[in-house]
A protein has these predicted regions:
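N-terminal positively charged helical leader segments and presequences
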Residues: 1-76, 127
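RNA substrate-binding interface of SAM-dependent RNA methyltransferases
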Residues: 72, 76-158
Length: 161
């Protein structure tokens, strides 16, 4: 069953419009009204808003750029490690950082902190660093969707010296 990250509170019985990226993915998979998907949204800041785990959902409406789902039963699934692992890593070359974020998210790392060290190959200006953090966030979300993790390491910090 396809899994999608949904950055909104999830409650059983609610109707929800999927975010643009997830909606496009549902359309590419050629899902139809009545098909089932799995939603998750848990990351730091969601404690008390939505319970951790997964929600079954059923596609109810397919539009040109809109997909609406009805949220079903909650399943309290915890696939992450018992202890929080925080990863601090010196900035490698560009593609390697993408790979590192992907694998760290698959392993269940709680947070990733890039470090600008004396020998770092990659140097980022403030504006470019913000764009990179957003990109790494989307890489982490994709990795969690694929591997079955329910906690996205959204605490990807800005690079520190």
């Amino acid at each position: 069953m396809p899994r999608f990250f949904c950055p909104a509170p999830l409650r059983t019985g609610d109707l929800l419009d999927l975010p643009a990226g997830a909606a496009r993915h549902v359309q590419v998979l050629r899902l139809q009204p009545g098909d089932s998907i799995t939603l998750f949204n848990h990351g730091p800041g969601w404690e008390g808003v939505s319970p951790c785990g997964e929600f079954e959902a059923r596609v109810t409406l397919m539009g040109r750029s809109q997909v609406q789902v009805e949220i079903g039963a909650h399943q309290a699934v915890e696939r992450e490690a018992q202890r929080a692992v925080h990863l601090a890593v010196g900035m490698p070359a560009n593609e390697r950082m993408d790979w590192l974020v992907e694998k760290a998210a698959e392993l269940g790392v709680a947070s990733i902190q890039p470090l600008m060290t004396e020998r770092s190959v990659l140097r980022l200006a403030a504006e470019r660093a913000t764009k990179k953090v957003d990109h790494w966030q989307s890489v982490a979300i994709s990795a969690c969707e694929q591997c079955g993790g329910n906690r996205v390491p959204v605490k990807i910090g800005r690079a520190h010296v």
